[in-house]
């Protein structure tokens, strides 16, 4: 099946859903299954669809320690891009779809956190958007309808590619590996099984992981507003998908305002009901990895000076973000559980002496740790050779951003003074 045939099937799917009162991304299970199978067998279909798959995945996965949540973030971004193209194709008379705010809303929280500004601009240019100023993208001349369908189909294929890569990681049994290795294996394989086998052989040859490349400049994380609408909007108006309380005469009926499943979970991401956006519960479960990749530095404000209060607050918060315990080490309690036990014992009995952490010898002066082993209670650099002994059974924690890394290093230095100095123990 060629790309032209896929485009026609995709167009019919969109128009069929519109007749049913839904104007959203494609959810046809048969088309989904067909496209999945074609993509698994032939990665080069992305080239025929002209969806810039290799550039987008290379950019979106670059520098991510754990690729599983990174792929979920990319899938959300591709769904939002697909929805923008579908809106222009199905509802070209809706003027609010001709302007996208680039300083807030879904653009910041879903797109800019995982993809570079250059690739986002290129993706929106395919839909006819041009940059009007530093805060807006606008459609001045709508592109042909067939081009919008092609762009939306490409984003649909990118979403499925995220699922294919996630399936590879699931069968591989790990999602902590270099992104370039995953993409190289995917392009060289004709099915999921051969891709997994290629990666298993490759990982068996590597004694230590290469250092992670740095992420780009973090995006500002602020309160989201509507992707299309202005900031000056009546908060008491009825909330809708696009911030319009009552459609005009040239707008479709209210029942056509489709909310795709993703946005039903966070309806205020695009709409403007005056309520703050809150991430879904599953996003909180994935908080141990950077939620949008480039937002690491914004998770905590930079302290003006070191203090034990900021150290304690940061370490307690990092315990909340810690991944669950390793099933192979049930006797090792997580820092969060240790803190709860310490609080309980201090209220009803003698306080339990907190565990001390040490900086491993791999950390040269001036370098910050990137990983923390809660089993050995040591801080490591990414390239540390001792990590090969920790990875199979120990509980490893990824330290998010320079602020958290600096505070953990300061904790290790304080622990060294408290527990290793003469007279520290009775």
From Swiss-Prot:
Disordered as annotated region, ranges: 204-223, 234-256, 269-300, 316-347
Q: Print the keywords alphabetically.
A: Phosphoprotein
Report the source organism.
Answer: Mus musculus
Top-level taxon: Eukaryota
**InterPro entries referenced in this protein's UniProt entry, alphabetically:** SPATA2_PUB-like (IPR048839)
A Pfam family assignment: SPATA2_PUB-like
Q: Which family does it belong to?
A: Belongs to the SPATA2 family.
Q: Does the keyword Disulfide bond apply?
A: no
Its protein name is Spermatogenesis-associated protein 2-like protein
Residues modified as Phosphoserine are 318, 326
